[in-house]
């Protein structure tokens, strides 16, 4: 093995790249690369990549891969990446396109070498979530100690290393934006070695982790916001590439886009997004940071139309802006929030944008107006407001001289004495503030004083730079209490910041990546929460618990944490009108008199607690469900307990008895009695398999509830099982 690592490639590859600058035609470029490969291949000694340890953990494969045995005869692209890095994410579309063009049968294999920056990124489950979230379909190895990184003397994320069929290093590409070279180098390398008979077409045993993922209502939700009334939520269902608008009980009102990624304006049924993140709602208009499309989208809930208001659909490199929105290239917008211009006459006439891809904060003028230290701007203009574009933790009285590092969350505090934007600056692990009087950028908590040190992270409660965060992605301002809540994503916590005292403390979460809805905030767990918002009245905080695929609810008054059930209106009828609910139940089939009535043990529960009833019914042998009949479950309560039913999902279809039917129920946050009884009923129609006889059967389960303060917020599951027998 050559000891010099990637440095051994530098002299020859530098000469090649200078020569490519002078080449006029594609043929000239191909010839130059071909001659370079002849030179590299005839070296007395290969620059050979070291073998990976067999103890390393792999994803998307049937087992560990040997670079020198399993990949002998392959052209290999090693992608040294860490999943927090926006530049690494920008590279993924190029790799997707490359592996679509060339498969392992063609002789090409891409290997992701995950070399973590943050401690949380060394954990295999965290990498699994990232592989799923970003649709990575090539093998990934968890090089948690960055052994290969150090052996090759890699210096930054991302770095690509192209290997020949002997594990011989041929090229390296540092940073993003080298698509043309990547495709040129790869295609000529494949051609060069195929001519020499050194390329093998064997399969390497890909086994995609995403194929084992069970379906869920949400997939890696990135952000959530709530309207001023507190009645509607907007959820960026990022992994499903869609936006959901729900009632506060989780009933879906609108599904916009999904389930596949795309880029299309139009009606809700045809619109398409690509990994949307930040959302902001005012009245019946929603703005969306359509992150991987590099767009800002506008959703009109009345017209049910999606339009593009900023971005051109490809990643921009412009760090100034100033063009009209739909003509202005932008880069990986991660969050959006409404604000006010200095001279505007309308409220919420500016949309602030966390432009993570170029480490800046931008503004989209929704009306004509003026920004701090700026000139008058026309409606529709999109431009940089703060940040030089250099990735750093630099505070400055002049907004254009300040530096951010992947700003990912924004929240507005418009009242005095704040009048600022709070920024969750993820890669510097800080919370910053931008004055809306003069644009000055100041530090609040986290990080350290050296603006170039982006490794000052940790999990420490404290004040100012003594507090430590780890890659915070979300932030929301509680104007009632004058406090700031932060999604400290890689610490799996929600933290609270007092901006007056610059103090930061843990509000919820243990620091363990898990999914426990515990008896208190600090006994509950999250898994990389990416966004959060607070009701206008300051009571409920909604958290996008990203890797748990859930929305969690923190009640700041009762200190109860619960999970928000996502209720699909196609399979579940929900209304706040009890008379309507009673009519719906009245129209459902009546259970036959022979239907058993099963008394369940009393269940201790707390206001706001979520209960999942897991219904599993078994038909007699040689019977089958009559799928044309109205097979259904429904929930009822005695007349003196009807307060339990308001806003609940009271009925739904039973389509398949081979698996459990999940029936969600959430106790009201205000309970009128300490004791109550729910009845969960089911009605099935089934026939003998020879269709000689069909029948209707029913079952009722009575669930007594003891409502108190025990098990506060805990998700409780109750199994309801019954086997029908032939009379």
Swiss-Prot record:
Q: Which GO terms describe its cellular component?
A: cytosol
The keyword rRNA-binding is annotated on this UniProt entry: no
Cited PROSITE patterns = NHL (PS51125), THIOREDOXIN_2 (PS51352)
Q: Which residues form the Thioredoxin domain?
A: 43-198
Q: Where in the cell is it found?
A: Cytoplasm, Cytosol
Q: What is this protein called?
A: NHL repeat-containing protein 2
Q: Which organism is it from?
A: Gallus gallus
> Which cysteines in this chain are paired by disulphide bridges?
none
Whether Acyltransferase counts among this entry's keywords is no
Q: How does it assemble?
A: Monomer.
Keywords, sorted A to Z: Cytoplasm, Repeat
